[in-house]
Swiss-Prot record:
Belongs to the DXR family. NADPH binds at T10, G11, S12, V13, N124, E126, G210. Pfam families: DXP_redisom_C, DXP_reductoisom, DXPR_C. Mn(2+) binds at D150, E152, E226. Its EC number is 1.1.1.267. Its cofactor is Mg(2+); Mn(2+). Catalyzes the NADPH-dependent rearrangement and reduction of 1-deoxy-D-xylulose-5-phosphate (DXP) to 2-C-methyl-D-erythritol 4-phosphate (MEP). It catalyses: 2-C-methyl-D-erythritol 4-phosphate + NADP(+) = 1-deoxy-D-xylulose 5-phosphate + NADPH + H(+). It comes from the Bacteria. The gene is dxr. Pathway: Isoprenoid biosynthesis; isopentenyl diphosphate biosynthesis via DXP pathway; isopentenyl diphosphate from 1-deoxy-D-xylulose 5-phosphate: step 1/6. This is 1-deoxy-D-xylulose 5-phosphate reductoisomerase.
Length: 390
């Protein structure tokens, strides 16, 4: 029986993970669930899955959760804050950790899980974007297993033999191709993009996701973050990581080899597929996702992304090339910009402009430890906030 900690259990990936776990009660049980502020939803999850521990973001939320659990006669231990998150991520009772907290908040517990030698199911791409060398060093030192959950990276993982994933160029890999739907504004007149509302931006044509990642998809910053993530996961330089727009979202990514072969992973756009793969690897289990019907789909199309339409993608490539703290700076500025857009404080096209301005002002420095990462993150956030009109 595998004991699972789910960091971010009330988010879309967390909910999908619980759906897969519920289908296999003979294989998996829940050790801990965490949420920032969705206390009622977390209490419902605790009632169903009966974790040993539940963690929330604040003391106030913890008190509220405790009342709800007591009313149901549940004996789940309640904690709050970053230290409690790190504790459930590294607990000896836990075998695997689903790292699904969105943004920089997920970095510390993800690192704690890696340092403790867990099987880390990585849905929090920001952990690698902000501190790629630190996380990969922790995995190597502890013997942790890092399983990508993003559908694109999970697809690459499935298309590349395990024996060559850390040295792909030496094993005949020419490049990897990360597919992107193009989001809701792929065909919209570029000159009208500053007029779009956040409600339009979060209406993804293929995937059901949270608001922040949906906006990232609309700007293609999400794909930019995935380029940086792929660099660390598969040890490939930026020029060997190509982004291809694929509106049908059926081909999740591809690996091109020097002999002319291209291997692709196909499937319906449902996060339960990569979650089930990562939970059971190297075995296979049912995810609840039906197989694709290629006859019904009939056509698959691909095109190159336009950096004029998607400047955030170019910013991510620039950050990867700059190295050091540049990706962390970019990520912090993006989180501030996206939240400002969701709060209707800036327009859609101001997102990339704000990020570029922060990246221009803040020089990249070496990343030596988690404290230096957080210092750069804080500075970039303060700078980004100072650029937003009051």
């Amino acid at each position: 029986m595998q004991q699972i900690t789910i960091l971010g259990s009330t988010g879309s990936v967390g909910v999908s993970t619980l759906d897969v776990i519920a289908r296999h009660p003979d294989r998996y049980s829940v050790y801990a669930l965490t949420a920032q502020s969705k206390v009622e939803e977390l209490a419902q999850q605790c009632a169903r899955f009966k974790p040993q521990v539940a963690v929330v973001g604040s003391a106030e939320a913890a008190k509220k959760l405790q009342v709800l659990l007591d009313a149901q006669g549940l004996h789940t231990q309640v904690g709050y804050g970053e230290a409690a998150l790190c504790a459930v991520a590294s607990a000896p009772e836990c075998d695997s950790v689903m790292a699904a907290i969105v943004g920089a908040a997920g970095l510390a517990p993800t690192l704690a899980a890696a340092r403790s030698g867990k099987r880390v199911l990585l849905a929090n791409k920001e952990a690698l974007v902000m501190s790629g060398p630190l996380l990969m060093e922790a995995v190597a030192a502890s013997g942790a297993i890092l399983m990508p959950i993003d559908s694109e990276h999970n697809a690459i993982f499935q298309c590349m033999p395990a024996t060559c994933q850390r040295t792909p160029l030496a094993h005949g890999v020419e490049k990897i191709l990360l597919t992107a739907s193009g989001g809701p504004f792929l065909k919209r007149d570029v000159n009208t993009l500053d007029q779009v509302s956040w409600q339009e931006a979060v209406a993804h044509p293929k995937w059901v996701m949270g608001r922040k990642i949906s906006v990232d998809s609309a700007t293609m910053m999400n794909k930019g973050l995935e380029v940086i993530e792929a660099h660390w996961l598969f040890d490939l330089p930026a020029e060997r990581i190509e982004v291809v727009i694929h509106p049908q979202s059926v081909v999740h990514s591809m690996v091109s080899y020097v002999d002319g072969s291209v291997l692709a992973q196909l499937g319906n756009p449902d996060m339960r597929t990569p979650i089930a793969h990562a939970l059971a690897y190297p075995e296979r289990i049912s995810s609840g996702v039906p197989p694709i019907d290629l006859i019904q789909i009939a056509q698959l199309s691909f095109e190159r992304p336009d950096f004029l339409r998607f400047p955030c993608l170019k910013l991510a490539y620039d950050a990867l090339q700059a190295g050091g703290s540049a990706p962390a700076i970019m990520n912090a500025a993006n989180e501030i910009a996206v939240q400002a857009f969701l709060d209707s404080r800036i327009g859609f096209r101001a997102i990339d402009q704000l990020i570029a301005r922060v990246m221009d002002v803040m020089p990249s420095v070496a990343i030596t430890d988690i404290e230096s990462v957080f210092a750069q993150d804080r500075c970039a956030r303060e700078l980004a906030n100072s650029f937003i009109p009051s």
